Amino acid sequence: MLLLAAASLVAFVLLLYMVSPLISPKPLALPGAHVVVTGGSSGIGKCIAIECYKQGAFITLVARNEDKLLQAKKEIEKHSINDKQVVLCISVDVSQDYSQVENVIKQAQEKLGPVDMLVNCAGMSLSGKFEDLEVSTFERLMSINYLGSVYPSRAVIATMKERRMGRVVFVSSQAGQLGLFGYTAYSSSKFALRGLAEALQMEVKPYNVYVTVAYPPDTDTPGFAKENQTKPLETRLISETTSVCKPEQVAKQIVKDAVQGNFNSSIGSDGYMLSSLTCGMAPVTSIMEGLQQVVTMGLFRTIALFYLGSFDSIVRRCMMQKAKLETVDKTA
């Protein structure tokens, strides 16, 4: 009887595995596609642009610094696979004025055609204890990390729905899946992208438009190096419990997931665990994905409790260390 039950379970899983591709989105063909990348002058954004260009896409790079844009353009063009490919550069702050963002998207579409894939990669990170952060820091991060993704997405979505095809990618962070010491401003702005993505996916899925939320870990980028200069000790020690990823590795995974129409894009085993653990009511791209989340949830929650205990221990040790230093200073 037990053997029969096991055989039935295996047969059921195999059936799901075979049926799953039939209900998954049709992959987006990148050769000849128009890909817009905000925050594309450096870091993950630039690497995403390179990865798409390698596969034959036409690229529109959007960022604030014109000099960095032109430098990135030269680097990306080295990876062309045919002489028809184009890299268009547009200098604009995507978080300030929606009408300006809408206009530059129209310009890009007039030159390179309708946008097939938008990658919202513009963002920044600032860390610090809640009471030490200025209120303006919360406003700034919400503007750049959240509205800086809302505006470009709003500018392309109508055309995608009309064409009944497209991809919209939101680059969040693992700090957009769990809140950590020092990230009260950053995490909240990245968590907001998850809610936006889930609601938007439900709206546009009937039009064959698919949304991807990427949750990269700490990545070796200029932004990460700058963030480390002011990162609280507790935040730095927690971050050091995992390794730093290369932006090329992160970009390759994001592009792969976006092309496939996957809602979640995670990097590495920790990323996979976090995405499964925090899936909530998020959409799934395949039956197998949903089944994996159901099966692994209990195990991953158990592992997560050990992680949380470790992080809390780091915070307590730092607190005790500071208290000792204060005592020494008072007695000196």
Swiss-Prot record:
The active site is at S172, Y186, K190. Residues 1-25 form the signal peptide. It catalyses: sphinganine + NADP(+) = 3-oxosphinganine + NADPH + H(+). GO terms for molecular function: 3-dehydrosphinganine reductase activity; NADPH binding. Gene3D superfamilies: NAD(P)-binding Rossmann-like Domain (3.40.50.720). Its EC number is 1.1.1.102. Residues 291-292 are lumenal. It is found in: Endoplasmic reticulum membrane. The chain crosses the membrane at residues 270-290, 293-313. The keyword Mitochondrion does not apply. It is a multi-pass membrane protein. Residues 26-269, 314-331 are cytoplasmic. One of its GO terms (biological process) is sphingolipid biosynthetic process. Keywords: Endoplasmic reticulum, Lipid metabolism, Membrane, NADP, Nucleotide-binding, Oxidoreductase, Proto-oncogene, Signal, Sphingolipid metabolism, Transmembrane, Transmembrane helix. Pfam families: adh_short. One of its GO terms (cellular component) is endoplasmic reticulum membrane. Belongs to the short-chain dehydrogenases/reductases (SDR) family. This is 3-ketodihydrosphingosine reductase.
